[in-house]
């Protein structure tokens, strides 16, 4: 007995139609709707509407099924039910058809609106260098290495970066949190770089970060700033060029980079040599070259600006070298007080720790004296630790 159905269309068919319509809309192929309508009409004509497993059907399998059935009945004569007209059969009800048109209209409007928004939020480009111009207004931003093209929404433009610098200067003065400050300065520098901002403000940022890094002994970060500064200076951008030229000379003494030092000296201008900081750095170089440790340690105590911080990087090495020379020049021993003054120690405790780290030999009769001959090999062994310079130095 034929099963009666209250609805002319199975629920699974309605779901199948919905899937097909969605696919057609997502793939922008409205002609697929007409094909689905035609294929389902053929199944209706053949009386198969309730026999097909619509839940597992897709458009391709429906095509194959319909084609196979058409082949089977091609030569058979049978009474064909009245074809379904557009009014009798529709993939959607009239209300659904209206909803569908409304959705299409809205999608078109949304598409147009999104295109307009895209145009209104088009990348702003600096006409001078072709770089992007950031849109972010955040004063603080963590530093993250770029793995793709910079997003203007996360990049701060120059006016915001100037506010950021003032905030960082204030926070450094009040909090002295180097980990935070270094991260923020690197983020600031990154925003300058991606926007190709190379001006006096850029120089100021790198100079301030370089000084802070020096103060905290972060050689790696200082060197990055120093390298970029001389790149900016080469464009004629004004800054504290003489101050950082002096630092560069001292840094080369630390790294023992003789080739670069010779190149720098060959390109020095007469006006550079008249600057107090540059003159001091050149005198330090001369004292080291001639082995004049008396002069060297005097210059260490009177280093201008932040030159003392740079000399701190290699002061222990020069103290060991000076002790090797004194061990050969003095016999039999020297007092701790004399050595502390000669080697420019400000605290006797630091002097004691220095000789202890080098395993210096003390006079058993007078613990306040260092035996020169007996300590020679100890200082020479200690000097080997300074043979390789760690120019990375990041903390």
Curated annotation (Swiss-Prot):
Residue ranges of the region described as Disordered: 91-127
GO cellular component assignments: cytosol; nucleus
Source organism superkingdom: Eukaryota
A Pfam family reported for this protein in Swiss-Prot or TrEMBL: SAC3_GANP
Keyword terms, alphabetized: Cytoplasm, Nucleus, Transcription
Domain PCI as annotated: residue spans: 218-384
Compartment annotation: Cytoplasm; Nucleus
Family: Belongs to the THP3 family.
PANTHER family per record: 80 KDA MCM3-ASSOCIATED PROTEIN, LEUKOCYTE RECEPTOR CLUSTER MEMBER 8
Functional summary from the UniProt entry: Required for transcription elongation. May also be involved in pre-mRNA splicing.
Protein name per Swiss-Prot or TrEMBL: THP3 homolog C2A9.11c
Protein species of origin: Schizosaccharomyces pombe (strain 972 / ATCC 24843)
Biological classification of the source: Eukaryota, Fungi, Dikarya, Ascomycota, Taphrinomycotina
